[in-house]
């Protein structure tokens, strides 16, 4: 059976959907190429501005957050003690080794406790990574994840399911461009009165995340194992 890697990119969207705004170069060349060559579409998530863990919960379990209390985070409530059906459990039943991977603190949203209740054999968080590079506001860059995925794939003989959560695109986005930071992409024709610096900073972060996706696809294509990347 093929390896399966599910990649959840932090605060990621296609900026070409923002009308009238122009960019000095293509922001997401790798994602656009992949979208044209393979199945692609849009996903609606249950949160905005915060709540990554609730997106994770819906994606992994298929359970709607509307079934919970207003503002509830299952990671902080029921999953502290309960086991929940998930894609990881389904794949374990098919013989997969199951892994969660996140380049941020393992205790954030109690992931270090919760992932075992969602069927994962291992959870690798930033505490177990080395040679980490950080962006100007202190979040780990996603480029480190390619090597971490490689380590997981090398750690088992059989098929692996790796649920990967990135963090580079996380806010808060600065209202002034950080000192000594020279963004590769410039934003033009932006909305009057809006926070152009914050948007330009964000655009450059997702551009780097797109580069990471390209590097990951290249690595997986050169590896002598079938792999599905979602």
Regions found by a protein language model. Give the residues of each.
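Solvent-exposed soluble domains appended to multi-pass membrane proteins
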Residues: 6-9, 13-230
């Amino acid at each position: 059976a093929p390896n399966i890697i599910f990649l959840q990119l932090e605060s990621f969207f296609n900026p070409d959907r923002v009308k009238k705004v122009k960019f000095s170069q293509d922001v997401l060349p790798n994602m656009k190429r992949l979208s044209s060559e393979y199945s692609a579409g849009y996903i609606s998530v249950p949160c905005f501005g915060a709540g990554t863990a609730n997106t994770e919960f819906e994606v992994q379990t298929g359970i709607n957050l509307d079934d919970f209390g207003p503002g509830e985070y299952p990671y902080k409530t029921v999953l502290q003690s309960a086991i929940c059906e998930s894609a990881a459990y389904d794949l374990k039943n098919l013989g997969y080794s199951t892994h969660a991977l996140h380049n941020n603190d393992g205790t954030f949203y109690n992931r270090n406790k919760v992932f075992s209740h969602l069927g994962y054999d291992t959870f690798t968080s930033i505490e177990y990574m080395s040679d980490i590079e950080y962006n100007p506001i202190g979040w780990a860059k996603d480029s480190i994840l390619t090597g971490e995925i490689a380590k997981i794939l090398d750690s088992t003989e059989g098929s692996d399911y790796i649920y990967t959560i990135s963090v580079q695109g996380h806010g808060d986005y600065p209202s002034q461009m950080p000192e000594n930071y020279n963004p590769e992409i410039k934003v033009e024709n932006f909305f009057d009165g809006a926070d152009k610096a914050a948007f330009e900073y964000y655009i450059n972060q997702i551009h780097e995340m797109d580069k990471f996706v390209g590097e990951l696809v290249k690595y997986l294509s050169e590896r002598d194992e079938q792999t599905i990347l979602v």
